[in-house]
């Protein structure tokens, strides 16, 4: 609402374990505590989902994650638990249009992607299944496409999925497929078919390509 913001407060050991809401122009002692992590081995933080519809609170230690969410347009803040923490299970929640997307290592050592309708978080479906000896990376959302990455045998690959057809294909920047040790996506405008891909190999200096998904 441009009138307030959230911040985390450190405990005596300088670990963020509380999240407050501050309204600009009001005294700090009137700030509202919206979340507190009771477990001293966990820390917490807050972020905005890709579509900016939800704030997501993430509480974690080095091996376990638990996340909460609440609508960004609400005045009555009541964080909702997405999935109760399970030892050694990490997950990351994001939202895009009518879905929550979840990157998780539960029953998938190298991660997988699940999704569910925003209004039915208990009905999860597999979006990107786990692959043997392949690390499944995160997602980048455009209005008509979903871009994702994966890594196997030290080679990074980038895939584009058409949201309407659900068809997916790999982006190939170069025939030099023996090594793509670093690939990144940089995107601000979601209403586009163009993405920027950072690419380099053992014998090719780093470059940034603009890639049009429609014209290739």
Give the residues covered by each predicted segment.
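Peripheral, non-catalytic segments that deliver or gate enzyme domains
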Residues: 1-216
